[in-house]
Amino acid sequence: MEQRRKRSREALYLTNTPTTIAELAFADRMQIAFFDKATQNRLSFSGHESFQCRSLWLKKGYDFVNTGHSFTDEDAVVELGVGKNMVNAIRFWMKAFGLTYENDKPTPLANKLLNDIDGWDPYLEDEGTSWLLHYQLITASRASTYGLIFNGLRRDKIEFTKAHFLNYARRQAEIRGESVNDNTVKSDFDVFVRMYYRADTQTKERDEGLTGLLTDLNLMRPLRRKKEKEDDLHFVIENTEKSSLPDAILLYGILANRQFDLSVNFNTLLTEPDQAGIRELSFKSIPDSMTVLAKYYAR
């Protein structure tokens, strides 16, 4: 296992040239544009059947569609070995992470990441892959809660609760001329929490691969207060430096952003709104990041 982990880490973060990363990043730009057109950038808080994405689902989903199957096939339940609701959930998360198109065909990123023959990290063993998926989840805009929280809510409130998010989602929907179902939004927030926060009671679930896919990033934690009910629990998103973020993932996040051209001000990455896909990677200190840019662009 350790040898395989080392191989995937080298393949993903050491041997990829800037050209390879750039090609994939610009393909991702077009992919996000396609998703925006397909969804008309509408808010979405459902589709996951109340299941957070589990550790093996993306690989399972990729292997399924990469052999020509579709999640709408009659035998999808049998082939995937899960119930109908979980089939729907796997399909949702594949799209939410930007790994499949509307027709269930794999995207370029999915092929680069999950292919058994030459995929960078087919079994999602490296923490750097989790950072990449975190970026994808926010920027693919298929699961609105993640962008709303990382791009907006945490700017309004350092600490936030489910009720805070519900009110924020209502305001954002009103701005867009849309409406939201309160129960759906609250359920989606619960899934968001399980995606990023692993409670002590979930130790057994972790051993069985049932915890949220991004809990190891330790991006979010609860603030415990006496006599606080579960729905009133306050959360905070950490703003600490993350040494586990590989240089290549930072570069990918910058190049894949459609708002950037041939150059970008570094302060923009840190302070401008709507840069959550990059800024919320919580990347390393400024000197390290500048070194990264010089390393890749000076060639």
List where the protein language model places each region:
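Cationic, low-complexity basic patches in intrinsically disordered or flexible, solvent-exposed regions
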Residues: 3-7
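Polybasic, low-complexity terminal segments and linkers that are predominantly intrinsically disordered
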Residues: 11-20
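Donor-sugar nucleotide-binding helix/loop cap in glycosyltransferases
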Residues: 26-299
